Amino acid sequence: MSSNWVDISKDTNTGIETIRAHFTGHAYDPHWHSSYLIGVTESGIQQFHCRKKQINSHAGQVFMLEPEEIHDGHAPASDGFTYQMLYLHPEWLKQRLQGLFHNSPDHYELVIDAPLKSDDQLAIITSQAFRHLHYKEMNIVKDNSLDVLIQYIAQGKWLKKASQSS
């Protein structure tokens, strides 16, 4: 019997999906998402390849990916790893950024400078937002925790993206 498990939830107001999961051994093949990912490794070591590097996320570390970043997943230790994650849709995030930062031009997007962060405050803020969405707290509580998270991760990190030609 496998000790792997996955618990998925979706917030009806924001469309944000949350996942809490535990994997041992091979967790998932290389893939990508159309959303921004931000999560916290709760226990164990989560090993993944991203941006042409092998990354080891330990308990308490935060991992963040931009849309379409290819990554995989593996548990190098026999006891596996547990993580929690939020999937933030780019359009929702863009609207939220413009609401929080009124000087945010339409043609700018959030850029994740590094996929792994050792930042205790960010881990706490991310876990709070996860819990409030995953366990369906009141909307005002969810909205506030998301605003705190977005303000923390944005911290002035903007990069002009080239517009796609039609």
Regions found by a protein language model. Give the residues of each.
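N-terminal regulatory/effector-sensing and dimerization cores
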Residues: 5-106, 135
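Amphipathic alpha-helical segments enriched in hydrophobic/aromatic residues interleaved with Lys/Arg
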Residues: 102-166
